């Protein structure tokens, strides 16, 4: 399977939780109850029966969401196959271009550096917990370790950004007849995908995100100017290694290669 640009998408909407739950209860009926009963959380994680029941309900809801998504994918595939099978081609002109492009990093400002430095100093005064509630200790220690790591990452990026202002990315572009596929390493915001598709000479252009670069650095978000200005989880300095200018460079380089192999 491949994933198109989806860095600014999530398969849920937070403003109609009650309606969503009612829909799944009507759709899946007794399955929802079975899913709740199947998930037996350890008592050490959730000491009270009420907590365990609440978490089991969350598990059932998440499972229903995934069932629903899977069913919609199957339905969409079956519908498309009805008419797509009318144009099955056994011979195609295939080309594969690979190159490494350089993209502008998102710079850390002096103010952001000072803020993260001070935050790191404060976090170092906080102790990791042991000997208490196992689940609560795990959550606390995981959050603390993550926050310390994030601060250190920002400080390191600030220290090397002048010497290394750009980051390499392996770009693959494939021609298959009248359609094309173009990869990127990011959780890419949809705007960039649309910019590429609108200028591509191909009849249809597929964007494949999270490709060619393994590891945590390969999957960082590539947010737009508007997203960074309005802030948010996927547009924070912790989650963006590349700037919006770098995102546009990705667009330009991808379009250039698409035109070359067309």
Region annotations inferred by a language model:
Residues 1-262:
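Non-catalytic substrate/cofactor recognition surfaces at enzyme active-site rims
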């Amino acid at each position: 399977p491949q994933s198109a640009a989806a860095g600014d998408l999530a398969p849920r909407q937070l403003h109609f939780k009650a309606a969503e739950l009612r829909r799944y209860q009507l759709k899946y009926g007794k399955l929802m109850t079975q899913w709740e009963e199947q998930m037996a959380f350890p008592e050490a994680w959730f000491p009270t029966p009420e907590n365990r029941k609440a978490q089991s309900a969350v598990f059932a809801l998440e499972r229903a969401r995934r069932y629903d998504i899977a069913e919609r994918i199957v339905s969409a595939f079956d519908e498309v196959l009805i008419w797509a099978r009318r144009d099955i081609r056994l011979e195609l002109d295939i080309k594969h271009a690979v190159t490494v492009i350089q993209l502008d990093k998102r710079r850390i400002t002096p103010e952001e550096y000072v803020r993260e430095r001070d935050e790191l100093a404060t976090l170092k005064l906080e102790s990791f917990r042991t000997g208490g509630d196992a689940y609560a200790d795990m959550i606390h220690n995981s959050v603390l370790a993550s926050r310390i790591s994030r601060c250190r990452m920002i400080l390191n990026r600030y220290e090397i950004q002048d010497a290394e202002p750009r980051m390499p990315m392996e770009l693959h572009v494939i021609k298959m007849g009248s359609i094309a596929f173009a990869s990127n390493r990011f959780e890419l915001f949809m705007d960039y995908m649309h910019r590429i598709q609108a200028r591509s000479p191909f009849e249809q252009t597929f964007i494949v995100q999270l490709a060619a670069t393994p590891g945590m650095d390969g999957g960082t978000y590539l947010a737009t100017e508007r997203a960074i200005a309005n802030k948010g989880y996927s547009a924070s300095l912790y989650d963006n290694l590349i700037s919006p200018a770098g995102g546009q460079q990705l667009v330009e380089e991808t379009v250039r290669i698409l035109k070359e192999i067309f």
